[in-house]
C-alpha cells in the first residue's frame, strides 16, 4: 500500500470515529483490510458507511469491520466486475456502482446488487464502461461512459433502465460530469476537451488548443 493511500484511509478512519462512539482512528492495510491499494473512489453515504471502489472489489467499512464485494460467476446479484470505477448516491439514497462493464444499484436490505439495463440509441443492449454518474438539480441522472458517450436514467415505478442520449456532445469518451451552482452542466471528455451547457441547453466547447 502506498503512503498516500495509507494516509487517506487513516484520515477517513479518524473522521468516521469522531461520530461513532469515540473510537480511535487506525491505519488500514491491504493485507488485513482493503482488497486493493488501487483506489478509484472513496465515498461516505448518508448512513455514515464508507465505500471504497478499487480495481479489485468494492470495500464497505461500517466503523468496525470491512466487507469486500466481488464478482461471483454463479451469483447474478454480485458485482458485475471487480474493477469498480465510480460510486454515486442520489437524493433518494440509492447507491449506484459503476464498473468496467455496467451499472448497478446496491440493495442495503439484502446486501446485493441489481444490474440496470442499458441501451444504445439503436435499441441494442450494452454493458458499457462507466466513468461518471451525476444527478442534476432537475432530477435527471446522467451516466458518462468510456466508449459510448452519455446515458440518461429512466425510472418508471420499480423499473429502472438507462438509454443513450446523443444531444449533448460529439465524444464517446466521457471522463467526468459536473453541475455548478448556476445550473451549468460541464462534461469533460478524453478526446475532445470540455463542454458546458447552460440552462437553455446552449453549449460552449473548450478544446484546450
Task: Please provide the spans of the model-predicted regions.
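Carboxylate-rich, polar loop motifs that coordinate divalent cations or form catalytic acidic clusters
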Residues: 1-209
Amino acid at each position: 500500500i502506498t503512503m498516500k493511500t495509507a494516509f487517506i484511509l487513516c484520515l477517513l478512519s479518524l473522521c468516521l470515529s469522531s461520530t461513532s462512539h469515540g473510537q480511535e482512528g487506525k491505519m488500514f492495510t491491504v493485507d488485513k483490510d482493503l482488497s486493493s491499494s488501487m483506489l478509484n473512489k472513496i465515498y461516505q453515504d448518508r448512513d455514515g458507511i464508507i465505500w471504497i471502489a478499487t480495481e479489485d472489489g468494492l470495500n464497505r467499512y461500517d466503523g468496525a469491520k470491512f466487507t469486500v464485494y466481488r464478482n461471483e460467476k454463479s451469483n447474478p446479484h454480485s458485482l458485475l466486475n471487480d474493477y469498480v470505477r465510480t460510486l454515486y448516491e442520489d437524493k433518494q439514497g440509492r447507491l449506484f456502482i459503476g464498473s468496467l462493464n455496467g451499472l448497478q444499484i446496491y440493495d442495503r436490505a439484502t446486501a446485493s446488487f441489481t444490474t440496470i439495463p442499458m441501451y444504445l440509441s439503436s435499441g441494442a443492449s450494452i454493458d458499457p464502461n462507466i466513468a461518471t454518474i451525476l444527478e442534476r438539480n432537475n432530477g435527471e441522472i446522467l451516466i458518462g461512459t468510456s466508449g459510448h458517450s452519455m446515458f440518461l436514467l429512466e425510472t418508471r415505478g420499480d423499473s429502472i433502465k438507462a438509454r443513450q442520449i446523443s444531444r449533448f456532445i460529439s465524444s464517446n469518451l466521457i471522463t467526468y460530469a459536473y453541475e455548478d451552482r448556476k445550473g451549468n452542466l460541464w462534461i469533460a471528455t478524453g478526446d475532445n476537451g470540455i463542454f458546458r451547457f447552460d440552462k437553455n441547453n446552449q453549449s460552449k466547447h473548450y478544446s484546450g488548443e
